[in-house]
């Protein structure tokens, strides 16, 4: 079974995981009501997408 030959330092461990960070989601203002929404999604507050009313689907 493989065994580490040397201790992995904190800085080396941190460098390896540096790209695993969370990114801040992109937010844009809704053209209808001005609330912040993610792009290409229906607005939760007014229900519009590209200035068109999206019908509510009941599940």
Swiss-Prot record:
UniProt keyword annotation of Ribosomal protein present: yes
GO molecular function annotations of the record: structural constituent of ribosome
Signal peptide start-end: none
Disulphide connectivity of cysteines: none
Cellular component, GO annotation: large ribosomal subunit
GO BP: any one term: translation
Transmembrane segments: none
Keywords of this entry: Ribonucleoprotein, Ribosomal protein
Entry similarity comment: Belongs to the bacterial ribosomal protein bL32 family.
Protein name: Large ribosomal subunit protein bL32
Organism (species): Malacoplasma penetrans (strain HF-2) (Mycoplasma penetrans)
